[in-house]
């Protein structure tokens, strides 16, 4: 994602002393408003990159006036819940306290970015205002994002460098044991040991919880109590680098909760273990919410026994909290449970189940919904250590390996599988057992020693004295036991970002691999991507087989009318991915660089840099794990053309490097013995044309001339001025215009006439025309489409318009016609539909594509 900043030259050196704010700044303000997520970005010293700049930010107040300081306004603001995937927060320090702010107030703050607004919080990014007039209240009662669970010994890279969540200044939540309580004096609080090492007694890795006597915060905790604490994550490093010294500052007494009878915990908290693998909270009664990963009656004939896991989350739509699983085990089956049932369970934690996992003995069990999606499997290796596997207990996992032993008689039936990380699956070391029961309805029939299998199920461990025994996999569905010999087909699905149709078979360009795949397969000469022709929307389509109108990702960003703000996307689409559809059939999926499949169906994922590294990672994944579906992204053609154009030596070199990388990947399939069963799908997400005229200022001139108040969502992310009626978002080759307020017919007619009169505008699409193109409502009320050679951009080459919607698409495989040109119109959504058909994987209802019968023999 491009993060464009206009960082100005004036630097303010802030002087800190106890109880005193930094001096005022004369720094020139940054234009428009700044996203809190971007404000949270640090330099290598742990300080905000915008240090010393004057910014305007919008956020939600997390703590009322007077709680953190009794003489000035000192509080934190955070991004609202609807944008938590791009979460950020900052402290606000404003002279005086005549104006009072409440939790949930939506405020716009203008001030100088400083490193700590209070002596004890040095290292925490803050905004210092000149006066209370620099804080404007724009609403109240706004919901805050839920506190995010962290360990009390967080690493800097975990809490400040995550690409989607930066926790300094944000609400966090810790669980642990209390020590060193300070109940008197001005500074009060205690320490909590909830460190990742599982030793809650030694005080190593503990975190301070701190407040002041005037705050009104009360606490009844004592030494040795188990507590859950919610508050704002602060930093108190005295000097550079500001990468440690984290503590929690609560905003109210409700943020300090003793774990007593039936306390509600997250599953990831309830399953905390001691160093010996036993339940940390053993003997305590708690309440948890989750989803049944399997039915009752399958793991035990007469007792309640199943795994309960965290609800499956959609990254970008839901806050992505740490997941966990519990082994629910109790005498009798008072309440039958089916896979996918949403549950609320109250019971006692321990290690009392049939297996050695942390267990919950239920006193009450309530089914609140049915047919809910179950947490996706995490791919593991059979030789992973207990430390690597401990956090995955009772959650869905997937292994692939060679069968070294079988026991298919008696009540307990097993496979022993060697899927070790070293790739040697024949030496019998680093194996893991797969268990089913004779009464479970699951069968191992037909499996033989020496063959490869893919097994999905719950990660369990043998019962026994602490430290508890070996891990094994317990399947919950027959589809979770797959013989690789029954799935010989392999598919290489290559995503080519900004790949023009004419990049192959150009004179003097050396692309023998592309040429061979085209001549040995079918090239679709009338293939089209989604409109607008932007990467985020089209890559989402390539990963889901859904039109933008179905997956609701219109572009990189859009204007959200409901919340009056600009919203950006990463993975926020609530439809199944091709990886998830393959996974539902027990098949293995790998992805290289395609982040839209990361945690969304890719069992194996690798992030890469250069093209050579992409090829190397793909080759290693094919040779070692051999996924049924491999998705590889090459984004270099897009970035190179933006900078250098579509015809020079730079783009030629990149295309030839990708050609060479494809050759290496295909050779890996040959080494694996898949040459005869390999399917290859090559597809671009959009085209690319060179730009000779930038229309950005022309668009502004036209909007000025029409006289309708407007704002640019790229400059001001919202909230917007009260009189603003139009908000526009630039997408390079197009501009999306949103009606923030209704227009009169005269205004509408003048706007259309003005936009259509711009030289270089090919067309202005109205909402009814956009509906007919399968686009979502959040794309805009109007879209201004540039003619070829024109764009709202200064890049050498661009996309985003209808002129770049045609795409490169090739199918190659044992059932595909050879040397054919498929001239019937087809769409990028068809790629997933055809990949599913070749593998016999059922398509979800959200797949909009069609099987292209004309490309098959």
PLM regions with names:
Residues 28-485:
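OB-fold single-stranded nucleic acid-binding module
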Residues 719-834:
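Active-site neighborhoods of enzymes that stabilize oxyanions during catalysis
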């Amino acid at each position: 994602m491009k993060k464009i900043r206009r960082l100005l030259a004036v630097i303010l050196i802030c002087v800190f002393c106890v109880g005193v704010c930094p001096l005022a700044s004369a720094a020139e303000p940054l234009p428009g408003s700044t996203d809190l997520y971007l404000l949270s970005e640090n330099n290598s010293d742990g300080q905000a990159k915008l240090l010393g700049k004057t910014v305007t930010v919008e956020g939600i107040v997390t703590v009322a006036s007077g709680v953190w300081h009794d003489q000035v306004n000192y509080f934190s603001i955070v991004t609202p819940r609807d944008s938590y995937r791009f979460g950020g927060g900052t402290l606000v320090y404003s002279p005086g306290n005549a104006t009072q702010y409440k939790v949930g107030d939506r405020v716009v703050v203008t001030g100088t970015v400083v490193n700590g607004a209070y002596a004890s919080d040095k290292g925490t990014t803050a905004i210092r205002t000149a006066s209370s007039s620099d804080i404007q209240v724009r609403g109240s009662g706004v919901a805050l994002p839920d506190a995010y669970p962290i360990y009390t010994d967080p690493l800097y890279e975990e809490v400040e460098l995550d690409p989607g969540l930066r926790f300094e200044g944000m609400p966090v939540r810790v669980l642990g044991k209390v020590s060193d309580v300070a109940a008197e004096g001005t500074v009060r609080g205690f320490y909590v040991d909830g460190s990742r090492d599982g030793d809650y007694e030694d005080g190593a890795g503990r975190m301070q919880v701190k407040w002041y006597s005037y705050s009104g915060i009360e606490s009844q905790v004592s030494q040795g109590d188990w507590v859950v604490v919610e508050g704002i994550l602060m930093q108190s490093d005295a000097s550079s680098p500001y990468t440690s010294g984290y503590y929690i500052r609560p905003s109210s007494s409700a943020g300090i909760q003793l774990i007593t009878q039936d306390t509600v915990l997250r599953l990831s908290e309830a399953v905390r273990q001691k160093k010996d693998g036993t339940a940390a909270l053993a003997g305590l009664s708690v309440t948890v919410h989750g989803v049944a990963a399997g039915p009752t009656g399958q793991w035990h004939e007469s007792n309640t026994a199943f795994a309960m896991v965290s609800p499956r989350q959609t990254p970008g739509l839901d806050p992505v909290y740490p997941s966990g699983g519990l082994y629910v085990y109790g005498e009798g089956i008072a309440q039958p449970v089916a896979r996918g049932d949403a549950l609320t369970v109250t019971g006692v934690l321990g290690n009392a189940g049939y297996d050695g996992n942390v267990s919950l003995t239920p006193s009450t069990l309530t089914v609140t919904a049915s047919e809910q999606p179950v947490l996706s499997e995490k791919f593991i290796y059979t030789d992973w250590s207990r430390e690597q596997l401990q956090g995955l207990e009772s959650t869905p996992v997937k292994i692939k390996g060679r069968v070294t032993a079988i026991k298919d008689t008696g009540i307990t039936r097993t496979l022993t599988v060697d899927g070790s990380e070293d790739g040697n699956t024949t030496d019998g070391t680093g194996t893991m057992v797969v268990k089913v029961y004779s009464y479970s309805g699951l069968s191992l029939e037909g499996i033989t020693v020496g063959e490869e299998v893919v097994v999905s199920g719950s990660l369990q461990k043998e019962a026994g004295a602490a430290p508890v025994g070996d891990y094994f996999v317990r399947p919950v569905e027959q589809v979770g036991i797959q013989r690789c010999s029954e799935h010989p087909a392999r598919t290489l699905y290559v995503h080519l970002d900004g790949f023009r149709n004419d990049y192959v078979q150009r004179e003097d360009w050396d692309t023998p691999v592309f040429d061979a795949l085209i001549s040995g397969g079918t090239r679709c000469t009338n293939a089209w991507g989604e409109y607008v022709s932007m990467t985020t929307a089209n890559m989402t389509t390539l990963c889901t087989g859904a039109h933008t109108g179905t997956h609701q990702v219109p572009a990189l960003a859009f204007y959200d009318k409901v919340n009056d703000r600009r919203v950006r996307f990463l993975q926020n689409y609530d439809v199944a991915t091709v990886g998830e559809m393959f996974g539902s059939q027990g098949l293995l999926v790998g992805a290289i660089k395609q982040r839209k499949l990361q945690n969304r169906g890719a069992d194996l994922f690798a992030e890469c840099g250069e093209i050579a590294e992409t090829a190397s990672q793909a080759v290693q994944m094919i040779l070692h794990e051999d996924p049924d579906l491999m998705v590889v992204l090459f984004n270099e053609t897009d970035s190179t053309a933006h900078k250098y154009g579509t015809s020079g030596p730079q783009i030629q070199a990149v295309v030839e490097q990708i050609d060479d990388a494809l050759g290496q990947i295909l050779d890996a399939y040959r080494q694996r013995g898949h040459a005869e069963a390999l399917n290859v799908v090559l597809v671009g997400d959009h085209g690319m044309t060179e730009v000779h005229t930038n229309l950005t200022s022309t668009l502004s001139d036209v909007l000025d001339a029409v006289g309708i108040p407007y704002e640019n969502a790229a400059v001001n992310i919202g909230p917007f001025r009260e009189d603003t009626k139009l908000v526009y978002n630039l997408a390079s080759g197009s501009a999306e215009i949103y009606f923030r307020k209704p227009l009169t017919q005269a205004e509408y007619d003048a706007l259309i006439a003005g936009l259509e009169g711009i030289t270089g505008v090919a067309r202005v699409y109205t909402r009814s025309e956009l509906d007919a193109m399968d686009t979502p409502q959040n794309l805009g009320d109007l879209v201004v489409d540039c003619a070829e050679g024109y764009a709202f951009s200064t890049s050498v080459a661009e996309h985003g318009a209808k002129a770049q919607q045609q795409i490169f698409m090739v199918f190659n495989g044992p059932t595909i016609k050879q040397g054919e040109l498929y001239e019937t119109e087809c769409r990028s959504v068809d790629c997933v539909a055809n990949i599913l058909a070749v593998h016999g994987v059922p398509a979800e209802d959200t797949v909009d594509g069609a099987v292209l019968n004309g490309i098959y023999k």
